[in-house]
């Protein structure tokens, strides 16, 4: 959290109204999780207190709105991207689905409490496949048995299929569809193209132009639209015994084709294998096998996902442009840096486009 005793006391007071029966609250052990991304600031901490005359403690997670421009494009006008949209989506999914979501403590829109909007949720214990270094090169995934690796990926795809069964209207998530907009792939393509062009300004990005031209000529029909996670990948799941204990990071949630989520999942599989030249470990299913796993869990046929995999890589390349713009604005990189143009996301996109050139 931000430095300063006063803010810690304000968080204590805020928690005192939300941790039922807790008195004498103290906060300790603040730390940032390993592999934190570029969106909302995250802090893990422990709250100790008394309840019914007995000492107790609870591990919690604080997510603060970043002062920087949001990483993702705004799906719903009037809703902040980083914190607001994520808390609302998680609340709806906890109430209207069996998707594993962390228990929520509360959401605060009043920036006077900690200087920024924030929410607090309970900590969910488990392991997370990190991407620096890649989990396909070291860590628990490499140490796992081939059977457990396969079981883990299959379980993640089962959770994704379960998410896609959620009726967004019954769950109260219809606010994710702006008035007058037909949700689906065509709308998402428009949204992301506008987002990337705005971030590029007058700079040229030939690979983005090539990808957009290819995508525009091949917009598929959507099987249906549903709640899309927006950042579906193993690294956004907390795993326990190779099973999803908690899905995280819903900043990019939208109402779109379920194939958009699956394409993002498969693009990230490419990103941790072919993009860096890392061989698939024994037991790891191929992308075709993963598509079949998802189809079996979803109970529907899933066709060629090349469009959605390339669309995913295009979005990822656009996100890097946005993140690099933020980095330059903060004075952390020089204005003439070219990471926005040359990075692992563009390598991934280029490799995918080579297959269709």
State the predicted function of each range:
Residues 227-229, 234:
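Catalytic-loop of the protein kinase fold
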Residues 248-253:
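Activation of the activation-loop gatekeeper triad in protein kinase-fold domains
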Residues 31-208, 218, 224:
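ATP-binding pocket architecture of kinase catalytic cores
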Residues 304, 318-357:
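Helical subdomain adjoining the active site within ATP-dependent kinase catalytic cores
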Residues 1-27:
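Juxta-kinase regulatory segment immediately upstream of eukaryotic protein kinase catalytic domains
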Residues 225-227, 245:
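Conserved protein kinase catalytic-loop anchor
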Residues 259-299, 312-331:
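Active-site activation/catalytic loop segments of kinase-like enzymes and analogous catalytic loops
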